[in-house]
Amino acid sequence: MAATEGVGEAAQGGEPGQPAQPPPQPHPPPPQQQHKEEMAAEAGEAVASPMDDGFVSLDSPSYVLYRDRAEWADIDPVPQNDGPNPVVQIIYSDKFRDVYDYFRAVLQRDERSERAFKLTRDAIELNAANYTVWHFRRVLLKSLQKDLHEEMNYITAIIEEQPKNYQVWHHRRVLVEWLRDPSQELEFIADILNQDAKNYHAWQHRQWVIQEFKLWDNELQYVDQLLKEDVRNNSVWNQRYFVISNTTGYNDRAVLEREVQYTLEMIKLVPHNESAWNYLKGILQDRGLSKYPNLLNQLLDLQPSHSSPYLIAFLVDIYEDMLENQCDNKEDILNKALELCEILAKEKDTIRKEYWRYIGRSLQSKHSTENDSPTNVQQ
């Protein structure tokens, strides 16, 4: 693929591959730009940084298309190549086409200059999901020895506007890797999660930061706080599992008992929400649901006052685990499981009645005796 491909409005994905041929040497800044900077220096004027407030937004009335700028006269814009017979061709705005035609040109030349860096900002303003622009911007950050702390401020502002964009979070991650400074990250992510506590981009970044820089301290307390605010948030339950799995683990009986009882208390608050039930099943399933001491009795005690499809389904899972492990009273346990499957099918989870009847038939087929097959599951 040519270096200029994949930079249209809809381009997304991972980092672009290395070119087949060695890249050309970076072009120096054009004479017009160099002369302008020299004149400004002689006059004692500061040359504006691309991150200065003086940056002209594309929405500004004073914005000038690149093709009309004298300092870009040395560049031949490279149009997007949609092939000889494009189908359903995207109609780009004149401004979008202008910016990306010039971006393709500097990318093709591998021009590592201040003007190319400023151009990436315009391209990002038009489409912050374009991975090629972000990649080239990072090349320029290194080549031009830009202030990475300023770049962190820049990406912070963009993420606050577009918090569900893969490319902006990846750019931030690379900056944190370069700086080896995670000091702002947990607070920043918490601010983003305050806007949407289920933003998986933010959670993914948080997990990476914590794991990369060993920031495990206080994370479980943070999770506790979020669960108190919204016990239904499956993302927070996932974070709880992530933290404990990577710290104490669940093999310590005291940790496991704490988590089981913690989860049961949360279930009492919202018995009809699946998140806590999934967590409970996740931490016990590999150990055997029926083998955890007194869990069955605790759930049976909950059933009269906190009955829900999830509680009954969990009981079915426990009974199935008992059957798989060759329990003594096999026929009695099987009948209890079949009865619960029928309750789910007829009363508690009717939208999945065929599923529960299938589960019942499967249990019956696998675990009933040949001479005395239970008949309380409808066909």
Swiss-Prot record:
It holds the Pfam family PPTA. It catalyses: L-cysteinyl-[protein] + (2E,6E)-farnesyl diphosphate = S-(2E,6E)-farnesyl-L-cysteinyl-[protein] + diphosphate; geranylgeranyl diphosphate + L-cysteinyl-[protein] = S-geranylgeranyl-L-cysteinyl-[protein] + diphosphate. The keyword Magnesium applies. Activated by the AGRIN-induced phosphorylation which is mediated by MUSK. Changing K164N: Reduced activity. Residues 19-32 have a biased composition (Pro residues). Keywords: Acetylation, Magnesium, Phosphoprotein, Prenyltransferase, Repeat, Transferase. Its EC number is 2.5.1.58, 2.5.1.59. One of its GO terms (cellular component) is plasma membrane. The modification Phosphoserine is found at S373. PFTA repeats lie at residues 112-146, 147-180, 181-215, 216-249, 255-289. The modification N-acetylalanine is found at A2. Phosphorylated. Phosphorylation is mediated by MUSK upon AGRIN stimulation and results in the activation of FNTA. GO terms for biological process: peptide pheromone maturation; positive regulation of Rac protein signal transduction; positive regulation of skeletal muscle acetylcholine-gated channel clustering; protein farnesylation; protein geranylgeranylation; regulation of microtubule-based movement; skeletal muscle acetylcholine-gated channel clustering; transforming growth factor beta receptor signaling pathway. Heterodimer of FNTA and FNTB (farnesyltransferase). Heterodimer of FNTA and PGGT1B (geranylgeranyltransferase). Belongs to the protein prenyltransferase subunit alpha family. This is Protein farnesyltransferase/geranylgeranyltransferase type-1 subunit alpha. The gene is FNTA.
